[in-house]
């Protein structure tokens, strides 16, 4: 066995033999190390045969990590390692081999698109009542709806499925999204065609695997015997189908270990729920373990993230425990408006690149892709290579291209080049219930030399009244646009066009997921704001063309390292040395369109725990700061971390009264007990503890414990070092009374003036340079900052 030093918490997991177990592992906890060492021990000690052990997860990345880690030991090679989807497929394949069902072909992830196109052709052939709706169908949106239904065991036609009675306790009839009732009918047709073709899609695998087990007891028995011990990683991400599948597989023995972090449950919109992991202990009478040590984040991130997530009520109480020390930083930048914020972020990245950091070490995490326009422009201007992971550059996104297509088509002159693509993009956006055949007929006239206006009116002349009315309305819209091109700014015209089309409302209504539709609508709102200072329509289109030219290549064609921009959803499970989080304001973090405040707080927690070194938070001073930062009292937390870190780095005889008090107060408040006992390992620890205890004794003697903010719990932390305080030098804590906490009073807030000396908890002493609308411009040693006075908590010196 390879020699790896495990913590006591990891060792407890490795030592677990049989029976149900639940492991809560914080971000960056090294849980994979504990899990594979448990598997290795169980094999080595012959508790289970390796081929009868299953290590699985929803996440392909987690499974790959497990597989790589297990490869170190020859005797663990027989352990079954697979995703939950692969487990479901294996069960279906077993049933097919027994002749219990037909399985002609398995389609991998992504093949659903081709199947959907065949389903749409069938719908048009059948002339279904909702056929006109198909012209505006967003394939990804519908397939996400289908995937969510299947993940939650929501059947297209539950009665037709004829499930056994016990299965009906968890399975249910699917419902259509509000305003998209025809989605359910299309789901039914989708399933009909899929079954006719004998296909199994990626989303079918867990659901169909579960269905096989509830239908066929013999198959259930075979599968249960095949897996005598099951370990599930990233359990917070499982959905109902996966949870119920695992419940059946492990029923005879419950040698079932679930590992995850409820604080990182951020995929509720697609079926994951914290209840699966939070209810696991009670459901299975499982033994509970905690892994609290984080090997990723330094002290500022640990303290701030821990304070943020502690506000959630629906969670397993636990605290991130520091191991890495105090080398990292969390910076908070307040900027007046989005362009300034983007320039500040790009400037920070450029400075770090100049210091030798690599682009691949950096990530910009956003709540919505709608946040990226100004960020992308600032990166392009500084020639910083970037990639938008999971999306495209903002000017290529369908919701933005949809608006721009109207402007391109309204340009004077003959329509050529991409004009047909623009036309096909907008003729039914928003819904006009015009057929593709009619759209082709209009464009045929354009290709023959007619203007788009003339082509629309010519087709209207021969159409039935309802269709003719819509064609004429569209012609009138383009006539209005053509007349406004030279008269209005791009911003004004786009705002008027969006209002006339009710475009954002259309985006919201045309999505089966509020999260998706709201993101697109927000993207349009952000783009309209982005266009505000871009001049005329011609100027805007030229600007976008230049952005496309200057954007440094396609990542698929250009191997250069890039800064990544991605949503927080995509960042879970990943880490970078340098993390940048813009728009830490109310309305974005948390997102104003979300009703689930606890999930929004979990999202912010995930973002805060991605960095292994430096985190940069940006907020607009013109908007309320994120309540997640306010309720966490971020300035006090970061200030306390800085003071404690400075004190721990000093020899005991150099600790001032203020620094000793910082240790006495801050170590317990920051939850540093485990760090100080297990990871600090300072040679001078006994002397430091003795000095802190002498301060407690001095405060107690003077009756100042409460007035100094010193608690019995804080004292116990230092008493655990088992040292005698001893006698310090005379006057060791002279001036301690200066640190007595004054009771708060209803006194007026300080009045600030230019030239005044002030102190900020993070940036230190500075001088007020300017004041405007509640925002102070202050010159600090490391540069000039603009700070919102209601949040900055400046102290007058």
Give the location of each predicted region.
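P-loop NTPase Walker
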Residues: 1-102, 221, 303-306, 609
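Conserved helicase core region in the C-terminal RecA-like lobe
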Residues: 80-90, 231-234, 259, 368, ...
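C-terminal accessory regions
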Residues: 585-782
């Amino acid at each position: 066995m390879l020699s790896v030093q495990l913590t006591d918490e990891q060792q407890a997991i490795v030592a677990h033999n049989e029976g149900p177990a639940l492991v809560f592992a914080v971000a960056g906890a090294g849980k994979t190390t504990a899990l594979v060492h448990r598997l290795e021990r169980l094999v080595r000690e012959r508790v289970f045969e390796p081929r009868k052990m299953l290590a699985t997860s929803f996440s392909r990345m987690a499974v790959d990590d497990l597989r790589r880690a297990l490869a170190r030991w020859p005797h663990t090679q027989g352990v079954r390692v697979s995703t939950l989807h692969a487990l479901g497929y294996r069960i279906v394949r077993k049933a097919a081999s027994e002749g219990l069902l037909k399985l002609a072909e398995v389609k991998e992830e992504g093949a659903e698109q081709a199947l959907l196109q065949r389903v749409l052709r069938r719908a048009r052939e059948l002339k279904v009542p909702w056929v006109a709706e198909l012209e505006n169908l967003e394939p990804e949106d519908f397939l996400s709806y289908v995937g969510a239904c299947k993940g939650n065991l929501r059947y297209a036609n539950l009665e037709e499925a004829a499930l056994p009675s016990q299965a009906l306790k968890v399975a249910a009839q699917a419902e259509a999204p509000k305003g998209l009732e025809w989605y359910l009918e299309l789901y039914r047709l989708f399933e009909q065609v899929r079954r006719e073709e004998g296909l199994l899609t990626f989303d079918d695998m867990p659901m169909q695997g579960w269905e096989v087990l509830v239908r066929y007891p013999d198959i259930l028995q075979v599968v249960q015997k095949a897996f005598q011990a099951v370990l599930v990683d990233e359990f917070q991400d499982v959905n109902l189908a996966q949870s119920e599948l695992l419940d059946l597989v492990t029923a005879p023995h419950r040698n079932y270990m679930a590992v995850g972090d409820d604080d990182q449950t951020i995929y509720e919109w697609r079926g994951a729920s914290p209840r699966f992991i939070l209810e696991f202990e009670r459901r299975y009478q499982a033994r509970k373990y905690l892994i609290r040590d984080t090997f990723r984040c330094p002290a500022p991130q640990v303290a701030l993230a821990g304070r943020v997530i502690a506000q959630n009520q629906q969670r397993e109480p636990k605290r991130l425990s520091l191991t890495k020390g105090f080398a990292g930083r969390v910076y908070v930048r307040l900027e007046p408006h989005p362009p300034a914020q983007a320039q500040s972020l790009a400037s920070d990245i450029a400075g770090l690149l100049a210091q030798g950091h690599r682009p691949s070490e950096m990530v910009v995490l956003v709540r919505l892709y709608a946040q990226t326009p100004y960020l992308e422009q600032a990166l392009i201007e500084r020639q910083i290579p970037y990639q938008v992971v999971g999306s495209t550059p903002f000017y290529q996104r369908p919701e933005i291209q949809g608006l721009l297509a109207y402007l391109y088509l309204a340009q004077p002159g003959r329509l050529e080049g991409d004009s047909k693509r623009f036309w096909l993009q907008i003729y039914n956006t928003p819904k006009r219930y015009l057929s593709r055949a009619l759209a082709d007929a209009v464009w045929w006239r354009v290709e023959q030399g007619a203007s788009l206006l003339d082509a629309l009116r010519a087709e209207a002349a021969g159409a039935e009244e309802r269709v003719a009315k819509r064609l004429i309305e569209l012609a009138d819209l383009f006539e209005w646009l053509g007349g406004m091109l030279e008269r209005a700014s791009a911003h004004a015209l786009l705002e008027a066009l969006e209002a006339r089309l009710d475009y954002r409302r259309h985006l919201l209504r045309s999505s089966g997921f509020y999260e998706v539709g709201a993101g697109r609508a927000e993207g349009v709102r952000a783009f309209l704001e982005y266009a505000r200072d871009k001049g005329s329509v011609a100027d805007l289109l030229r600007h976008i063309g230049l952005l496309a030219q200057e954007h440094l290549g396609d990542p698929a064609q250009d191997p250069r390292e890039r800064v990544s921009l991605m949503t927080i959803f995509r960042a879970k499970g990943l880490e970078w040395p340098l993390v940048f989080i813009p728009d830490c304001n109310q309305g974005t973090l948390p997102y104003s369109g979300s009703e689930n405040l606890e999930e929004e707080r979990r999202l912010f927690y995930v973002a805060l725990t991605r960095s292994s070194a430096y985190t940069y938070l940006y907020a607009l001073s013109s908007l309320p700061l994120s309540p997640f930062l306010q309720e966490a009292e971020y300035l006090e937390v970061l200030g306390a971390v800085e003071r404690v870190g400075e004190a721990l780095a000093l020899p005991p005889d150099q600790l001032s009264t203020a620094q000793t008090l910082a240790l006495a107060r801050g170590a317990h408040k920051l939850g540093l007990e485990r760090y100080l006992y297990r990871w600090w390992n300072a040679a001078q620890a006994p002397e430091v503890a003795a000095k802190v205890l002498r301060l407690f004794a001095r405060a107690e003697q003077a009756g100042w414990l409460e007035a100094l903010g010193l608690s019995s719990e804080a004292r116990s932390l230092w008493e655990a070092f088992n040292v005698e305080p001893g006698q310090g030098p005379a006057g060791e804590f002279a001036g301690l009374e200066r640190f007595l906490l004054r009771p708060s009073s209803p006194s007026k807030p300080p009045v600030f003036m230019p030239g005044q000396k002030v102190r900020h908890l993070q940036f230190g002493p500075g001088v007020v340079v300017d004041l405007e609308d509640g925002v102070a411009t202050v010159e600090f040693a490391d540069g000039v900052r603009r700070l919102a006075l209601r949040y900055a908590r400046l102290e007058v010196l």
